[in-house]
A protein has these predicted regions:
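Class I S-adenosyl-L-methionine
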Residues: 59, 87-284
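SAM cofactor-binding core of SAM-dependent methyltransferases
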Residues: 1-94
Length: 284
């Protein structure tokens, strides 16, 4: 739609190129078909999503940008779209996107990134964790915040006390809120990979100019417990059939905006969030 909608602007059409950040060979192929790509070039690709390094807490080693993953075959890396003649490229991460003015579209992207959940207790902000069945009595489970799924060996529990993640992430989010609101919160859900990626996108725009549009399920925030699982078009418990359901969580747009507002000396501005209706009406 974006290519068709801008096809009538000759100078824009001649200047634009399309860059997908996509690690799935199957989805790359679908994207190539959607854009009616020809002259396709392929190369070997790795499996798995490599999230940007979490800039807030070095504890998250799974967010490092240099994680080694196995090769799984060939996937699209370059082609040309017959819709408007634009060159199309695929990348494993933002770091390989070339410099230059950039328009970034994040459509239902951030809601698929991992989240961490925290709960205020008399021990402080504890983190919700997933573990094997602890064997606690029902009274003990209730006291420790455990949540068991019948027929499964996994359960959600609370950490014994504050974790490094709660020390860094929770305090950072709460300081942007009015004191009364911050003191009243009992649950908090945050997405470290989303915050880290938004920070990197802001740096890219600051350096090369452009804009980023995020379209997603979400709210101003802060959010509590929005993580949900969908399997066969039905909602299921997130611990039921792990690995077989699609997981998503609402986007904390206020948390993303906070990243921009706290960047020292940045020329990047952040607007919104607004509803999809408001956006479309403003465009006429």
């Amino acid at each position: 739609d974006l290519l068709r909608g801008t096809a009538g602007f000759d100078k824009f059409r001649e200047a634009v190129s399309v860059h997908f950040i996509e690690v799935s060979p199957a989805l790359r192929e679908m994207q190539a078909k959607t854009l009616r790509c020809v002259d396709v070039e392929k190369t070997a690709v790795k499996s798995g999503f490599t999230a940007p390094k979490n800039v807030f807490d070095d504890e998250y080693r799974d967010a490092r940008g240099d994680v080694s993953t196995p090769f799984v075959g060939e996937a699209h890396t370059r082609a040309k779209s017959e819709i408007n003649g634009a060159d199309v490229f695929w990348h494993d991460g933002l770091e390989s996107v070339p410099p230059g003015p950039t328009l970034v579209i994040c459509h239902e992207f951030f809601d698929a990134l991992p989240v961490r959940q925290f709960q205020r207790t008399d021990r402080g902000w504890c983190e919700k964790l997933i573990t094997i069945d602890s064997g606690l009595s029902e009274e003990g489970k209730q006291r420790e915040g455990a949540e068991k799924v019948v027929g499964r060996d996994l359960e959600m529990v609370l950490s014994p006390g504050p974790t490094p993640a709660s020390h860094v992430l929770v305090s950072r989010r709460l300081k942007a809120l009015p004191k009364e609101q911050a003191d009243s919160l009992r649950l908090l859900e945050l997405s470290p990979p989303s915050l880290a990626l938004w920070d990197r996108l802001a740096d890219h725009i600051e350096k090369h100019s452009g804009a980023v549009l995020a379209i997603d399920y979400g709210e101003e925030g802060p959010l509590g417990n929005t993580l949900e699982a969908l399997k066969d078009h039905k909602f299921v418990h997130i611990l039921d059939t792990p690995g077989e359901a699609d997981l998503s969580a609402y986007v904390d747009f206020g948390g993303l905006r906070q990243i921009i507002e706290e960047k020292p000396g940045t020329g990047v501005k952040c607007y919104g969030p607004v509803t999809q209706q408001q956006l479309l009406l403003s465009l006429g």
